[in-house]
A protein has these predicted regions:
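Positively charged n-region of N-terminal signal peptides that target proteins for export
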Residues: 1-5
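Contiguous segments within soluble domain cores/interaction surfaces
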Residues: 24-131
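Bacterial N-terminal signal peptides
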Residues: 9-17
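N-terminal signal peptide c-region/cleavage motif recognized by signal peptidases
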Residues: 19-21
C-alpha cells in the first residue's frame, strides 16, 4: 500500500512539474536593465538581463531580434540610434553598443526567442542618459 502511494505521489509531482512548464509563457520572462543610468556619448554599451520570473534566474542563449532604441520617453520616438550587438558578459545578459547623443530618457525595445518557449518574449526597457 505504501509503495502504491509513493508511486502515485511521484507520478503526481512529475505531472504537476510538466504542467507548470507547459503553462509557461512569454509573460514569465522579464528584461531588466543591468544599469538604468548611462553617460551620454558615442559607443555607449547598453546591457539588459533576461530573467525567468518564477525562479529569478537569468536566461542564457535566447535569440535576440528587432532591437531598437529611441527617445520616445521624451516624446521623440523618431529620434532613434543604431544598435550593434556586443558579445561577452555575464550569462543571461545581452549588450548593444549605441550612440546616446542627447541626455534624457531612451527606450530600448527588443524581442527574444527562448528555447522551448512557443511565444516570443518582448521587452521595453527605459534608460536615462546623463551629461
Amino acid at each position: 500500500m505504501k509503495r502504491k502511494f509513493t508511486l502515485a505521489a511521484t507520478v503526481f509531482a512529475a505531472v504537476m512539474n510538466l504542467s507548470n512548464a507547459a503553462l509557461a509563457g512569454a509573460n514569465d520572462y522579464l528584461f531588466e536593465p543591468v544599469k538604468a543610468e548611462l553617460q551620454k556619448g558615442s559607443g555607449v554599451v547598453v546591457t539588459v538581463r533576461l530573467v525567468y520570473k518564477p525562479t529569478g534566474k537569468p536566461v542564457s542563449d535566447a535569440v535576440i531580434f528587432s532591437p531598437r532604441i529611441d527617445m520616445s520617453p521624451e516624446g521623440m520616438a523618431t529620434m532613434a540610434a543604431p544598435l550593434t550587438p556586443v558579445t561577452g558578459g555575464e550569462p543571461g545578459t545581452y549588450s548593444f553598443k549605441t550612440d546616446l547623443v542627447m541626455a534624457g530618457g531612451w527606450l530600448l525595445s527588443l524581442s527574444a526567442k527562448v528555447q522551448g518557449e512557443a511565444e516570443t518574449v518582448t521587452g521595453k526597457i527605459t534608460f536615462k542618459a546623463t551629461n
